[in-house]
C-alpha cells in the first residue's frame, strides 16, 4: 500500500443537506440555504420539513408566491404541519386572500404548537382571525 489510502476512505460521503441548509439559514444566507434545501429535497422528496424550511427561506428572500407554493406542497404531504398553516396564513393575508388565510389559521389553532414561543404565535393567530372576522368584507365568512 505504497501511499494509497484504504479503500473505505474513498467512499463518497453523504452530505446532510437539510442540516447544512438550517446552518446557512441561521447565518442569514437564505439563498445558499435554498440550494441546500433543494438538494435535500432531491434526496428526500416526501419530507415535508424540507418544504417547510424552503417556504420560510423563500419568505425571507422576498419570494412570497414561491413560499406559498412550498407551504401548500408541504401541507399536501402532511396536513397536520402547523408551522406551514401558520406561515401560509399570513402570506395569504398579505396577498388579500382572507378567507383562505382564515382556514389555515383555524387549522393552526386546532392543533397549536407547544414550546417557549408557542403562546406568542397562538395569540398572533387568534388576533389575525378576529381581525378577519370583524372585517366588513369578511362578514359572509
Where is each model-derived feature located?
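TPR/TPR-like (Sel1-like) alpha-helical repeat modules
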Residues: 90-116, 123, 127-130
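Conserved structural position within tetratricopeptide repeats
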Residues: 39-42, 72-76, 110
Amino acid at each position: 500500500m505504497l501511499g494509497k489510502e484504504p479503500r473505505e476512505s474513498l467512499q463518497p460521503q453523504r452530505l446532510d443537506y437539510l442540516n447544512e441548509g438550517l446552518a446557512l439559514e441561521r447565518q442569514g444566507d437564505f439563498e445558499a440555504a435554498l440550494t441546500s434545501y433543494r438538494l435535500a429535497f432531491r434526496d428526500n422528496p416526501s419530507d415535508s420539513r424540507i418544504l417547510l424550511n424552503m417556504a420560510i427561506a423563500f419568505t425571507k428572500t422576498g419570494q412570497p408566491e414561491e413560499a406559498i407554493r412550498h407551504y401548500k406542497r408541504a401541507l399536501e404531504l402532511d396536513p397536520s404541519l402547523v408551522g406551514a398553516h401558520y406561515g401560509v396564513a399570513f402570506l395569504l393575508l398579505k396577498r388579500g386572500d382572507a378567507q383562505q388565510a382564515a382556514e389555515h389559521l383555524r387549522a393552526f389553532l386546532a392543533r397549536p404548537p407547544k414550546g417557549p414561543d408557542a403562546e406568542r404565535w397562538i395569540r398572533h393567530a387568534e388576533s389575525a382571525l378576529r381581525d378577519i372576522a370583524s372585517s366588513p368584507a369578511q362578514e359572509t365568512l
